[in-house]
Amino acid sequence: MRCKCVRDIVDEANRILFTKHHATEDRSVEYFFRGESKNFLRQRDGMNLPLDTSFPCCLDRDDGYIDHERDFYQEALRLNIASFEKDQTMVERLGRMQHYQVPTRFCDATTNVLMAAMFACGGGRHGEYDEEHDGYIRVIKAKKERIKSFTSDIIVAIAHLPLVDRKNINPSKKDDGLDYLRYEITNNRPGFAMTASPEIKRKLCEEIQHVWAFKPVWNTERIREQSGIFLAFGCRDNKEPLHPTFSLQDFNNPDAPSYGIAQVEVIQIQSDCKSRIREELRYFGVSRELVYSDLSDVAQEITPRYTYNNK
């Protein structure tokens, strides 16, 4: 079914969550949503790779992004240091960078299906409304033990990966290189648990090769209004992407990168109905100017409403 209005979207969400998956009865998992204005594809050697149920974090949408992960972080910080003055941790910094669309290992989602619908209808920054492609709301479930605190060791470790060269991270090898990562982390967080015992270090080597969900600090208006939750993507040797499937088959496979996190279904939005749905969402208190409260974004959102030739 291709949704044509907000009611269609809510009906589909109700069917998926409560009729098919009995979400209110299963206390072992949580459900959330990710809205995409089109089907984002991975790029390898100039070719699009099939996604099936998988979806990449922004950093994995282009080969060059992975190669220059450290540059992205350093340049974003150098060019706009004032924006990060209130951030006390790397997790908070990367969350803010994700907000401003800097490619990171974080992938944002929401517990609010209407907010996901806004993003699926192209409600991003800078007036970028995509009316040519169908939108998608990915319905995702995660085991509660795979949802971490923003202060947990594994989330902190993944957040510090941009500071370490690719060649120095090899979690599957004896010379795993995690001492480089530990050095960067302890600069910001003395007493990081990786130093506690070889067993904890071994566990981190395993965990860093998975995707994890975590609930971030609400340090931006977007994250607060979005009811945001993040997926944090770890890495393989040489910081190669994980390519998680997010399939139901891998949901219970501890060796799978997406263990404990799966896409259960996709709600599809008809491309030529996006404008109507955005207008309907405004009556439910969901609009871009609430999520992106910068004056430039607010201006770009409200100006077309009062233009005579806007039809």
Segments from the language model and where they lie:
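Catalytic-core elements of nucleic-acid end-processing and repair enzymes
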Residues: M1-K311
